[in-house]
């Protein structure tokens, strides 16, 4: 199990450099490109994760693979990660970096859970309403849960709005338990 706080520290360091150089977007794209290539190339994730392969050999492979595709700054960052034996964290580092960049851009992610698919128009309408309420640009993703009887649930960060039928029935049950019969 990878430690998210370790990934966050590396992402913060790289993000700090990106802000100083004014290259937040560019370096985010490069980091995501690195992760994509590593994760989709056969045997490459295992190669970078292998503890018996020396860091020098891994850095040579990284320099050959990514030398012309990313900036020297991103390549130096990857080499530093390899030196510190944190190459398995590159995916998590990229996610943490993306979260920091989104925060800088005033973007927040939200997840809508519904019993059935929701139309694109309804998704856009809900995104706009949530954006107005939060004061941030909301990027809404849909999760279909056929187990829901009806209604929907929205999660924004650590807040949950539960408007499912199951939740309403649970609240009604509690009200009935507390009602005094005379």
Curated annotation (Swiss-Prot):
InterPro entries in alphabetical order: ATP_synth_OSCP/delta_N_sf (IPR026015), ATPase_OSCP/dsu (IPR000711)
Record flagged with keyword RNA-binding: no
UniProt-annotated location(s): Cell membrane
Top-level taxonomic group: Bacteria
CC per GO annotation: plasma membrane; proton-transporting ATP synthase complex
A Pfam family recorded for this sequence: OSCP
Main localization (coarse): membrane
MF term (GO), any: proton-transporting ATP synthase activity, rotational mechanism
Entry keywords, A to Z: ATP synthesis, Cell membrane, CF(1), Hydrogen ion transport, Ion transport, Membrane, Transport
Residue stretches in coiled coil: none
Membrane topology qualifier: Peripheral membrane protein
Sequence similarity: Belongs to the ATPase delta chain family.
Subunit structure: F-type ATPases have 2 components, F(1) - the catalytic core - and F(0) - the membrane proton channel. F(1) has five subunits: alpha(3), beta(3), gamma(1), delta(1), epsilon(1). F(0) has three main subunits: a(1), b(2) and c(10-14). The alpha and beta chains form an alternating ring which encloses part of the gamma chain. F(1) is attached to F(0) by a central stalk formed by the gamma and epsilon chains, while a peripheral stalk is formed by the delta and b chains.
Classification via PANTHER family: ATP SYNTHASE DELTA CHAIN
Free-text function comment from the UniProt entry: F(1)F(0) ATP synthase produces ATP from ADP in the presence of a proton or sodium gradient. F-type ATPases consist of two structural domains, F(1) containing the extramembraneous catalytic core and F(0) containing the membrane proton channel, linked together by a central stalk and a peripheral stalk. During catalysis, ATP synthesis in the catalytic domain of F(1) is coupled via a rotary mechanism of the central stalk subunits to proton translocation. This protein is part of the stalk that links CF(0) to CF(1). It either transmits conformational changes from CF(0) to CF(1) or is implicated in proton conduction.
Protein name: ATP synthase subunit delta
Organism: Syntrophomonas wolfei subsp. wolfei (strain DSM 2245B / Goettingen)
Gene this chain is encoded by: atpH
């Amino acid at each position: 199990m990878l430690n998210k706080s370790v990934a966050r520290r590396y992402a913060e360091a790289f993000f700090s450099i990106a802000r100083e150089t004014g290259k937040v977007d560019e370096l985010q794209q490069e980091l995501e490109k690195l992760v994509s290539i590593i994760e989709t190339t056969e045997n490459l994730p295992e190669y970078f994760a292998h503890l018996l392969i020396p860091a020098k050999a891994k850095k040579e492979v990284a320099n050959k693979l990514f030398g012309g595709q990313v900036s020297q700054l991103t390549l130096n960052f990857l080499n530093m990660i390899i030196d510190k034996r944190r190459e398995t964290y590159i995916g998590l580092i990229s996610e943490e970096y993306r979260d920091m960049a989104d925060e800088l851009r005033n973007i927040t992610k939200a997840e809508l859970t519904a019993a059935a698919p929701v139309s694109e128009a309804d998704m856009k309408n809900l995104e706009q309403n949530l954006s107005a309420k939060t004061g941030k640009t909301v990027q809404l993703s849909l999760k279909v849960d056929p187990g829901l009887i009806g209604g929907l649930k929205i999660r924004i960060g650590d807040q949950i709005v539960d408007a499912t039928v199951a939740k309403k029935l649970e609240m009604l049950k509690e009200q009935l338990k507390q009602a005094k019969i005379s």
